[in-house]
């Protein structure tokens, strides 16, 4: 394998997306790998006072990884509560893909 330089690393598109069928919603979604910064923010958001906060964890993860065809997030963190009211089967499928990609 070749040694990589700074420019190569920083210019590489290393955030793959996976299209996932969600029949409960009548279509498909794209799940994207998080950046290192996004992953750190996610991990920080689920730990409070030394304890893990699992409240609405699937929806909280889903809003961070669901993207459009260009890779841009389609939800804000503030949408997690509303998304959490959607099908647990759909959220489980997205959450599993997010875990696999991240």
Give the residues covered by each predicted segment.
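Extended acidic low-complexity intrinsically disordered regions
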Residues: 1-16
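Short, surface-exposed, charged amphipathic helix/loop patches that serve as local interaction elements
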Residues: 16, 24-102
